[in-house]
Amino acid sequence: MTESVRLPAASPKPSTVALPGSKSISNRTLLLAALSDNVCEIHSLLKSDDTDRMLEALDKLGVQIEHLAEGRLKVHGTGGRFPNRSADLFLGNAGTAFRPLTAALAVLGGDYHLHGVPRMHERPIGDLVDALRIAGADVEYLGNEHYPPLHIGKRQDCGERVIPIKGNVSSQFLTALLMALPLTGQAFEIRMVGELISKPYIDITLKLMAQFGVQVANEGYRVFKIPADAHYHAPEHLHVEGDASGASYFLAAGLIAATPVRVTGIGANSIQGDVAFARELEKIGADVVWGENFVEVSRPKGRAVQAFDLDANHIPDAAMTLAIVALATRQTCTLRNIGSWRVKETGRIAAMANELRKLGAKVVEEAEAIHITPPETPTPDAVIDTYDDHRMAMCFSLISLLGVPVVINDPKCTHKTFPTYFEVFSSLTETAE
């Protein structure tokens, strides 16, 4: 029987939430530290299923990692060459581990088998593999063409230094290639073919690579130039920012319930694109206060939440939260340019539409968009399926702030990025029943 949690109708108290570390930054940092030529102490690392999969993989690859305290560990860099040249790596459903490790191992070469849960084997990787093969990598599909699982063999340098790659399915493919090619010591030029989605995630990658000593020239997100003789050198200490995508639920709570909610761990100078979510809330009725290490959202009780029509390409994960915010408005809301939702942890456009309809919303799905017309009052005690997708579970918790109880199936799927989410969410709410 599926485990579930019932959230009673509630309203948040004025609250402060300390965010867990960013998944995007945590897994990038772990891999870059492992490939550096020195030792790096990482602070505030996210503890989650996805980071556990990366840590397990690095251990199997021979990387020495000292666990010092919760959220703090010391990574002994390998100088850009993993000690173990053969390994079987299970990476769950962690795209932030699977894609970058695929590229790094393909560039270094060896005898590696990479696989995951069934959903990971439905998430495309062909555009990345195509680019790696142009760079001389030996990557073989072990199941369906263009999808994991994969076998990686020895790379043969064919002398090709201009690598085209598509960026319209997932920006993680470009991230993986950017992080891997410096391991060759050769100068490379990566050229985008077609549109690049989710550019803010590429900004995270480039800023972290710079912190690890590799400066990539970004020519308008069309061409990326990797210098010759590049190598990774880690900072002695690196602090992981709080998770900006995870912040979206609490910031939305402040807007929906017209109560000040502050998150700490991110701020005005965050390197994560999803901090732009707060700016989108500001456009539809929120008051936002920015600090160096916090963001606070509230709303005057007499001010309505405004409907929106948003191109959400820049905040694809946080945009899911806006789909719930739509129910706090009185008109049809639209999220556009969200085609990447279809290749995430689940097919998110269809999943979101299915569950919003259970609440009485009228929903129109398109290939790259979703249109949501809110009901007068959401259906109470709707049973929400989460599709083993952490963001579905966290998003729909906000329904309890709209005056009705809601039942969330499989709440433990939040362990992917935010294991304590429901405890934290409950701690900042007062039951209205």
Swiss-Prot record:
Q: Answer yes or no on keyword Kinase.
A: no
Binding locations of phosphoenolpyruvate: 23, 95, 123, 172, 348, 391, 416
Gene Ontology terms for molecular function? 3-phosphoshikimate 1-carboxyvinyltransferase activity
GO BP terms: namely: amino acid biosynthetic process; aromatic amino acid family biosynthetic process; chorismate biosynthetic process
Provide the top EC class.
transferase
Q: How does it assemble?
A: Monomer.
What the entry lists under Gene3D superfamilies is as follows: Enolpyruvate transferase domain
Q: Which family does it belong to?
A: Belongs to the EPSP synthase family.
**Which key words are in the record?**
Amino-acid biosynthesis, Aromatic amino acid biosynthesis, Cytoplasm, Transferase
Q: Which Pfam families match?
A: EPSP_synthase (PF00275)
Role of this protein:
Catalyzes the transfer of the enolpyruvyl moiety of phosphoenolpyruvate (PEP) to the 5-hydroxyl of shikimate-3-phosphate (S3P) to produce enolpyruvyl shikimate-3-phosphate and inorganic phosphate.
The UniProt catalytic activity note for this protein reads:
3-phosphoshikimate + phosphoenolpyruvate = 5-O-(1-carboxyvinyl)-3-phosphoshikimate + phosphate
Its name, as the record gives it, is 3-phosphoshikimate 1-carboxyvinyltransferase
Provide the E.C. number(s) assigned to this enzyme.
2.5.1.19
Q: Quick one: a GO cellular component term?
A: cytoplasm
Q: What InterPro entries does its record include?
A: Enolpyruvate_Tfrase_dom, Enolpyruvate_Tfrase_sf, EPSP_synthase, EPSP_synthase_CS, RNA3'P_cycl/enolpyr_Trfase_a/b
| Pathway(s) this gene product operates in, as recorded in its UniProt entry | Metabolic intermediate biosynthesis; chorismate biosynthesis; chorismate from D-erythrose 4-phosphate and phosphoenolpyruvate: step 6/7
Chain sites annotated for binding 3-phosphoshikimate: 23-24, 28, 170-172, 198, 317, 344
Q: Which gene encodes it?
A: aroA
* Chief location bin: cytoplasm
* PANTHER family to which the protein is assigned, alphabetical: AROM/DEHYDROQUINATE SYNTHASE, PENTAFUNCTIONAL AROM POLYPEPTIDE
The cellular location(s) given in this protein's UniProt record come to: Cytoplasm
Provide the active-site residues from the annotation.
317 (proton acceptor)
Keyword Nucleotide-binding on entry: no
- Check the record and name the HAMAP family matching this protein: EPSP_synth
Originating species:
Neisseria gonorrhoeae (strain ATCC 700825 / FA 1090)
